[in-house]
């Protein structure tokens, strides 16, 4: 393939499709993590392209915390049904029994039990040897130094000092029993690339990414959208309608909205062209402590 004749987005697309096909050919039991966000939507679109006109040769896995936005759950189920995908949903039963939630137990414990431990449970339960994720290197500093094929030991831990070289687009998927590889086909994409590709390919996304009047309150420097009644207002807090959208999606008590008037994809792209802040500025879990994302990844987080 003549790379010089491909546009920037088509080069990224070709690289990602190559990675997805490589994993499908190399591993015996891969899975695609599906977090319902924009990156997951792009990754799923690329996977469908990679195996068209056939169906996906692996299932989708959603590790559910019980605290995603309602619109995310609706979108997840509708998308899986529309594309004929096998969708696996796992929720940490111990966490559910303990009543773990972000308001009572805080973001760090909630993330560890419901996300990290939940993910490890699901990977062990189904015996997956490779798991696709939609993380990108431009998102956060620990992700910037992670390989496309990210080796995990039998406890699902990541060691940034023990990464494999990836020369000339050759990936080392050699593993022993119990070990696994996390695979990031979107590693070299930026947030702007994602939005331009969504626009180019007309990929459906969760409506929360588009600006609309939504009920929010200010707490701990974050605009929290109130998605259900599982919240106790603190003294002085007032819920008000504001024109907001989300740059990243997660559990609604831990994901801050941004004030915006961007109601269309071209308007979002225009915003991205002048933005000087990270999309993860609204993610509470990234503020738990210095280097919190790397610590989470060392423990088995995606």
Swiss-Prot record:
Which lineage do the record's taxonomy fields give for this organism?
Bacteria, Pseudomonadati, Pseudomonadota, Gammaproteobacteria, Enterobacterales
The organism of origin for this protein? Klebsiella pneumoniae subsp. pneumoniae (strain ATCC 700721 / MGH 78578)
- List, alphabetically, the HAMAP family matched: Sulf_adenylyltr_sub2
Q: Which superkingdom does the taxonomy of this entry point to?
A: Bacteria
Function of the protein: With CysN forms the ATP sulfurylase (ATPS) that catalyzes the adenylation of sulfate producing adenosine 5'-phosphosulfate (APS) and diphosphate, the first enzymatic step in sulfur assimilation pathway. APS synthesis involves the formation of a high-energy phosphoric-sulfuric acid anhydride bond driven by GTP hydrolysis by CysN coupled to ATP hydrolysis by CysD.
GO-annotated biological processes: hydrogen sulfide biosynthetic process; sulfate assimilation
Which EC numbers characterise this protein's activity in its record?
2.7.7.4
Named in its record, the pathway it takes part in is:
Sulfur metabolism; hydrogen sulfide biosynthesis; sulfite from sulfate: step 1/3
Q: Which Gene3D superfamilies match?
A: HUPs (3.40.50.620)
Q: Which CDD domains match?
A: Sulfate_adenylyltransferase_2 (cd23946)
**Subunit composition and interactions:** Heterodimer composed of CysD, the smaller subunit, and CysN.
The keyword ATP-binding appears for this protein: yes
What SUPFAM superfamilies does the record tag this protein with?
Adenine nucleotide alpha hydrolases-like
Q: Which family does it belong to?
A: Belongs to the PAPS reductase family. CysD subfamily.
Instruction: Give me the reactions it catalyses.
Output: sulfate + ATP + H(+) = adenosine 5'-phosphosulfate + diphosphate
Give the UniProt keywords, A-Z.
Answer: ATP-binding, Nucleotide-binding, Nucleotidyltransferase, Transferase
What InterPro entries does the entry give?
Answer: PAPS_reduct_dom (IPR002500), Rossmann-like_a/b/a_fold (IPR014729), SO4_adenylTrfase_ssu (IPR011784), Sulfate_adenylyltrnsfr_sub2 (IPR050128)
GO MF terms listed in the record are: ATP binding; sulfate adenylyltransferase (ATP) activity
Protein name as catalogued: Sulfate adenylyltransferase subunit 2
